[in-house]
Amino acid sequence: MALRHRFRAPAARTSLALALLAALPALADASGAPAAQPSTLDTVVVTASGFEQKITDAPASISVITREDLARRPYMTLLDAVRDLEGVDVGETRDKTGQGTISMRGMGADYTLILVNGRRQNNHGDIYPNNFGGNQFNHIPPLDAIERIEVIRGPMSTLYGADAMGGVINIITRRTLDSWHGSASIARTVETDDAFGDDSTVDFFVTGPLLPGVLNLSARGSWYERKASNPTYAPATDPAGGLHTRPLGFGSGSKTVDNTNKAGGITLAWMPSDNQTLSLDYDTSRQTYDNRIRINDSGVEEYPVGTVDTINSIWRASNYCSGASGANAAACRANGGTWARRADPRVGYSASQAFTRDAWALTHEGQWDIGNSFVSLARVATNNDGRTLPFTVAERERLLAMIDGTGAYAGMALAERRALAESTFLPRPKRTLESAQYTLDAKLDMPFQAAGEHTLVVGTQVIRGDLTDGVFGTEKGTPGLKQEHDMYSLFVEDNWKVSTPLTLTAGLRYDDHKVFGDHLSPRLYGVYALGEQWTIKGGVSTGFKTPKTTDLYDGVIGFGGQGTLPFFGNPDLKPETSTSTELAVYWQHPRGHNFNATLFHNRFEDKIDSQPCGAGLALRCTSSGEYAELGYSSSNRTVNIDEVVIQGAELAGRWQISDAFGLRANYTFTDSEQKSGAEKGLPLGNSARHMANATFDWQASDRLSLFLTAEARSRRYRGVSAVTGKELYYKDYTVLHLGASFEATGWLTFNARINNLLDRDFTTYQTTFTDLNGNGIYGDVTNEVLFEDDYNNKDKARSVWLSMNLRF
């Protein structure tokens, strides 16, 4: 018997939507005004080839998000900017802080390269262990500082190197100006359900000359705040009338804590001549999360993002079978093992979590007779503050003696032993998690004539970085070691206009990594113009991703089970690689209509994953060190395992119905299959197989525009049934948003949007009751009551977003 805990009448939702749509004409002049022109296929981009080109001419699948687009929607993280693009999925998962990730063409977040003005922002190692990875997408420039965002779908390692396997997101900020201008925005999202917390944002940007024509300044800043959310599941009633209350978790479970994200930056631009610019940029970002212990509605202590270190969390011990398998002492000894005992202290988090990033860049841009040059030296330093060190082997052995009252602690009272343990082991030492890297980029694009027009791009990249993780070395009893990351690259790419309609792009990149050696990344792409309205383009691109610095460490690289179970790295890992083929057709009409369709096929090899290791298994835990003494010779270790094929289609277009009305929409089909490894035949990750977005916009008057947006997702993979072995999928859904923008004056604009217009409930679930022992009582035997969520993420209920933008 299955029971859904809540029912919402779809008829009521539909009536509300129709009523709102019917009311729209009353808000505008009957005459209607020309619609604001959206970005078109003629938009100029730079990310696809390293120099300026139209979207239709660019050798890649690329989309552009303009500053005007960003101002019309709620904006807290990078996910808010890209969520409605074809090929982009921001709904795969949520981390412990409730932050999401960005996946492109079925590749996970680790395969998306983030750039700011062409400079890489990705960390070379994992400083967000234990499911905090969404925070990497929060270290972004303030809204008012962004000029546009260019998004490339598909591998781009020829130009950008490692990490660009799934795609590239290049955030391009506003340039300094020789006259004083600026803008400021303030916004708030008000929730209609008080179980969810409100969002507040403030942004500003200002630029102008310090020395006219010689030295310009720009400054930017933002302050984003998100209040805690504490939704609850409705209870389920079993056939006997008993109520079963199910707790919601943090992160993907929709519960979140208070958090703030503050960012600021400054740029100085010196123009010694009309064709030379030297700029110095500094940027800082601070995210904080409240992790204080709290009591939930059931009266139970809970830790929002991780176990806070207390005497109660460390005062734990258990029995285990050493050298064999066995659930109890008799079975263990019968299998030749030794029944033993060990301490299992749960630690790893302080009462506040903070994620910081500081970056600077010195950049020279020059225009020469032979072409244009770009040289940049940048440093990015990221810090995860608020983690604490798990217990070493020696500490665990001493703690066990205190718990059991043995050795030096024999005869001591329990309270005395607990007090001694608290003073000895608490507070825990800080677990340093710091990543820093210097990146030198140099590039020259040179136009020339030779059997047609050419634009040759040549360049180099040098990366020198290091990562410190407090757990490195714990297998030796010396925590706090450092891992280095050194890589050198050369690349060349030629954009050859063979004839008026045909352009070929060929490129090659050579990378030399300190650990695994060299790697070549070629690509070949063609663009053919079938007249003024039609363009066909396609090609083959390659991508590669170096193993994370953390994964390459030969020893303990992290802990699971709240600091109890060590995980191990592997210095013999190979880079992950991919080869992607795509074919696309583009059409544009002088009246503003446009359409594009793309087919893509991506072969992904040497995927890195974590697999069980230990005695009796094919994979040995060769770097467990001292932890083997406590029976941790069986755990998990990183290895290259899988080959995956991902293929699909992307459709996008705009229909300019009239001067006042327009409809733009896109659709993405993604199909993936793992060709090898333990999950052969199954999809990779849980990207939605079908994604669709549509926006109907109406320029009601010169000052007022309105729009209705729909987001649809279906067939999101959730795993395999343990009973039937069949693939399982989350429930399909469609969400509507209704928005408006009103330009009160030439310098003041108001924006508003109703998010989740029909108030879809994402906390619904299915319950299966089975009376296994036949006593008519459900829940007194394991697996008599089983819960299954309808949705992988518990998105918020209906809310109202309001913003005001001031320009000067």
Predicted feature locations:
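Gram-negative outer-membrane beta-barrel transporters
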Residues: 185, 497-499, 600-603, 622-721, ...
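Face-selective signature of the C-terminal outer-membrane beta-barrel domain
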Residues: 269-286, 331-516, 529-531, 596-599, ...
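Membrane-embedded beta-barrel scaffold of Gram-negative outer-membrane proteins
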Residues: 186, 363-365, 374-386, 529, ...
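Extracytoplasmic beta-strand/coil segments of soluble accessory domains associated
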Residues: 47, 79, 83-123
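Transmembrane beta-barrel wall of Gram-negative outer-membrane proteins
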Residues: 195-292, 321-322, 356-363, 450
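C-terminal beta-signal and adjacent terminal beta-strands/loops
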Residues: 124, 603-605, 712-719, 741-808
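Short acidic/polar hinge/loop motifs at secondary-structure boundaries
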Residues: 121-153, 204
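A beta-strand signature from Gram-negative outer-membrane beta-barrel systems
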Residues: 138-185, 807
